[in-house]
Amino acid sequence: MVKVSLDNVKLLVDVDKEPFFKPSSTTVGDILTKDALEFIVLLHRTFNNKRKQLLENRQVVQKKLDSGSYHLDFLPETANIRNDPTWQGPILAPGLINRSTEITGPPLRNMLINALNAPVNTYMTDFEDSASPTWNNMVYGQVNLYDAIRNQIDFDTPRKSYKLNGNVANLPTIIVRPRGWHMVEKHLYVDDEPISASIFDFGLYFYHNAKELIKLGKGPYFYLPKMEHHLEAKLWNDVFCVAQDYIGIPRGTIRATVLIETLPAAFQMEEIIYQLRQHSSGLNCGRWDYIFSTIKRLRNDPNHILPNRNQVTMTSPFMDAYVKRLINTCHRRGVHAMGGMAAQIPIKDDPAANEKAMTKVRNDKIRELTNGHDGSWVAHPALAPICNEVFINMGTPNQIYFIPENVVTAANLLETKIPNGEITTEGIVQNLDIGLQYMEAWLRGSGCVPINNLMEDAATAEVSRCQLYQWVKHGVTLKDTGEKVTPELTEKILKEQVERLSKASPLGDKNKFALAAKYFLPEIRGEKFSEFLTTLLYDEIVSTKATPTDLSKL
């Protein structure tokens, strides 16, 4: 049994005791209380060894894939779970019955208010890919959620007043996405190791808000990212059970939707729902991360080279198969099957281009509705009416009753050949342009970045980096020039893009394009491959102090 104790726990930041968003009096000190820290430290000590073992297991799978002796497939040892038609997910939770339009975004105070005021059903508040994990972003995200749930989030800036449109009980249901199992929070050390970022984000939010959310007629609801194995879902389930027992609420109060955004997880969808069981609220199609994971896990196999990113769509064979299997799986088990992101943002100065972009969104949502999804994501409040218009055609709060008849095989999930797919110089430029712009903003503390009229998050930068690594590694030939993709070519174009973007930057010489390029270069030359850009760059945004805070004074 793990003892509840803050011995050998070091908090390497000052704890703000002054409110930052008046008239609210909430401070960081109200979040980092002694009892809240004891709770997250207990969870970390109980589950961290298992977390690390599961991360090591990912690399075991990668080595087997790289050797060519192993191919991804449905797990024989869990066939009994897949073949048992009797088990189901739980009864749908209050506030999670109709999820036809979900908005997403980081927990910045203004964005939180705008999202809660949007004409949507649910709001995925994101500590993960659309947030740069600076200490202030993470801890003030907790402050902002604490205030929103207590109807005290309104605040003024010199240019604008931000106010909720009513009682939060009647506004969109909040679903929090903590950081993935692979990330750590280096501002808080437990037993000489940084605490799991997943447990930090989940634990603080749950500890302070679970009972308040139940009073609102909702509950502590989560989105779980980046999982690659059903045992990683079991780990979350174990965390949930301990957390609910600790604060004295019934097991099954927590609900979690899992993003199927890694290739290995696509072969274990039923097992993931099964492991969460009473806590499951379905699965979601995380399209860009799924493409990133497909390239990452198959990067050394010349049979799985993807073309220019704009040619990899939701109707590409391997993507279409994954979507159809997800919907069939979820609905057979009685849980939601959520669609993917519409990343478009309004183009205010070009009505024709804006209409074209909105038509693309509408067509994408129609495809999702027709396939059988129960709802979908938008990145901007202006897109919510389009999603609403489409999904109102369900005529019901969801379409879980509709089980599409389709058989998706392991071979279908690995069918990465895209008809008429091409790799061109423009594809290299586009990957470098998007990757550099996103990384530069992330290093400055922004994880939700408008680029070329799309709201981009970390997944799109990951695709950029992986594609370039893969094209260099396999020496592909460019369709437009006949030139071979080499480390020298990608480095040359990288330097050109850095120069162009630096000159155009409104920050002048304070921009971080050179720093972004330093990390990008060995990856796009094919010299190294990091599991995640976010972990690669993380130390650049950590801001710890030498002397730990005295926890007895919290």
UniProtKB/Swiss-Prot annotation:
Pathway: Carbohydrate metabolism; glyoxylate cycle; (S)-malate from isocitrate: step 2/2. A motif (SKL peroxisome targeting motif) lies at residues 552-554. It catalyses: glyoxylate + acetyl-CoA + H2O = (S)-malate + CoA + H(+). Gene3D superfamilies: Malate synthase, domain 3 (3.20.20.360), Malate synthase, domain III (1.20.1220.12). Disruption phenotype: Strongly decreases the growth rate on ethanol or acetate medium. The keyword Transferase applies. Induction: Expression is sensitive to carbon catabolite repression, but nearly insensitive to nitrogen catabolite repression. Keywords: Glyoxylate bypass, Peroxisome, Transferase, Tricarboxylic acid cycle. Transmembrane segments: none annotated. Changing residue 217 to C: In strain: YJM326. The keyword Transferase applies. Its EC number is 2.3.3.9. GO terms for cellular component: cytoplasm; cytosol; peroxisomal matrix; peroxisome. It holds the Pfam family MS_C. The active site is at 177 (proton acceptor), 457 (proton donor). Its main location: other. GO terms for biological process: glyoxylate cycle; tricarboxylic acid cycle. InterPro entries: Malate_synth_C_sf, Malate_synth_sf, Malate_synthA, Malate_synthase_CS, Malate_synthase_TIM, MS_C, MS_N, MS_N_TIM-barrel_dom. Changing residue 541 to V: In strain: YJM269 and YJM270. Interacts with PEX9. Malate synthase which takes part in the glyoxylate cycle. MLS1 activity is essential for cells to grow on oleic acid as a sole carbon source. Two steps of the glyoxylate cycle take place in the cytosol, the splitting of isocitrate into succinate and glyoxylate, and the dehydrogenation of malate to oxaloacetate. However, the formation of malate from glyoxylate and acetyl-CoA undertaken MLS1, occurs in the peroxisomes when cells are grown on oleic acid. Belongs to the malate synthase family. This is Malate synthase 1. It comes from Saccharomyces cerevisiae (strain ATCC 204508 / S288c) (Baker's yeast).
